[in-house]
Regions:
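C-terminal helix-cap and adjacent tail motif
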Residues: 6-7, 76-86, 182-244
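Short catalytic-loop micro-motif centered on adjacent basic/acidic residues
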Residues: 9-10, 40, 157-161
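Small-aliphatic-rich amphipathic alpha-helix that forms the alpha element of a beta-alpha
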Residues: 22-28, 111-174
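A generic local secondary-structure boundary/capping motif
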Residues: 29, 101-104, 173-177
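Short, surface-exposed beta-edge/turn micro-motifs
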Residues: 38-39, 109-112, 183-184
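Glycine/small-residue-rich phosphate/adenosyl-binding loop
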Residues: 43-137
Length: 244
C-alpha cells in the first residue's frame, strides 16, 4: 500500500491477457455490501473504441481542470453537504484545451478498463439524507483499489480515474451498457516508465481522534511500528499522489 502510487506513464510493453486475468483474479475478493459483487469490467481493446473513450475523457478533463484553475475542488458539494449547480461554466470549459500526456494519449495505455456497477446491487444506506450520498461507493471502490494493489504486486502500475463518469450517457451506446448499470471508474494499467515512488500521506495523528470529532489525536504508544516505517525510508506526511 505504501508503494502503490498513481502511475500514468507506461512503457509500450504489452500486458498479456493471462497477466490481466491474474490481476482480476486477486482483485475479485474485494468486499461489497451483502457480498453482492455488483461489478463488471470491460476490457477495451478495439482501437476505434479506445479513441472514442479518449475523446470523451478529454472533454471531462477540461471540465475538471476548469475547477482546478479556479481554485475549486471539482464538482464538490457545498458547505451544506449538497451539490446544487456547476461552479464553473462547463460549456466554456469544454472548449479550452487542457494539455495532459495521460488524457491526450489515453488510447495508447497498455490496459484500459472500464469498471461498471449494477446500481440495484448497491446497499445505499445514506439514501434520503440531506447531503451528498457516498455509501454506495463502498460496494464498488474496494474492488477498484484491489485492482491497483493486485497489479502492483505483479510488477505493474496503474491509476484509477472517475473523470470519465461525466460522459456516461454519451458512452452508454458504444459500450452497450444497459440501465441500471453505471460507470464507476476507468483504470489504466501497464509497466511504469519510472519506478513507483514511495507515497507521502498525512500522519495517523492528523486524521484520527478519540471519542469525538474534536477529541485528542491518537498517537503511537510504546512499541508502535511507526518508527519502523521511518527507518525503512518512508517519506514524511504530505498529500502527494492525489487521484483524479
Amino acid at each position: 500500500m505504501r508503494l502503490s502510487g498513481a502511475v500514468r506513464s507506461f512503457t509500450d510493453e504489452d500486458i498479456p491477457d493471462s497477466l490481466l486475468w491474474a490481476v482480476l483474479d486477486s482483485a475479485r475478493f474485494a468486499p461489497s455490501g451483502g457480498n453482492r459483487q455488483g461489478w463488471s469490467v470491460i476490457v477495451v481493446k478495439d482501437p476505434t473504441l479506445r479513441r472514442t473513450i479518449r475523446d470523451h475523457y478529454v472533454v471531462s478533463w477540461r471540465e475538471y481542470m476548469a475547477h482546478v484553475h479556479a481554485g475549486l475542488v471539482p464538482f464538490a458539494p457545498k458547505s451544506d453537504g449538497s451539490w446544487h449547480e456547476p461552479a464553473v461554466d462547463l460549456i466554456a470549459a469544454r472548449l479550452i484545451p487542457q494539455p495532459s500526456e495521460f488524457a491526450d494519449n489515453l488510447e495508447r495505455v497498455p490496459v484500459l478498463l472500464i469498471v461498471v456497477v449494477d446500481l440495484t446491487q448497491l446497499a445505499v444506506t445514506d439514501n434520503g439524507l440531506t447531503r451528498q450520498s457516498i455509501v454506495g461507493g463502498a460496494s464498488i471502490y474496494p474492488f477498484v483499489q484491489n485492482i491497483l494493489l493486485s497489479a502492483n504486486a505483479m510488477g505493474l502500475g496503474g491509476v484509477v480515474t472517475t473523470v470519465i463518469t461525466r460522459q456516461e450517457e454519451a458512452l452508454r451506446p458504444v459500450l452497450r451498457l444497459p440501465r441500471p448499470w453505471a460507470i464507476a471508474a476507468l483504470v489504466a494499467l501497464g509497466h511504469p516508465v519510472r519506478p513507483v515512488r514511495r507515497l507521502s500521506r498525512r500522519e495517523v495523528s492528523e486524521f484520527t481522534v478519540i471519542d469525538h470529532f474534536k477529541g485528542l489525536p491518537l498517537v503511537p504508544g510504546p512499541g508502535s511500528p511507526a518508527s519502523t516505517h521511518t527507518e525503512l525510508g518512508r517519506e514524511p506526511a504530505g498529500r502527494g499522489g492525489q487521484r483524479k
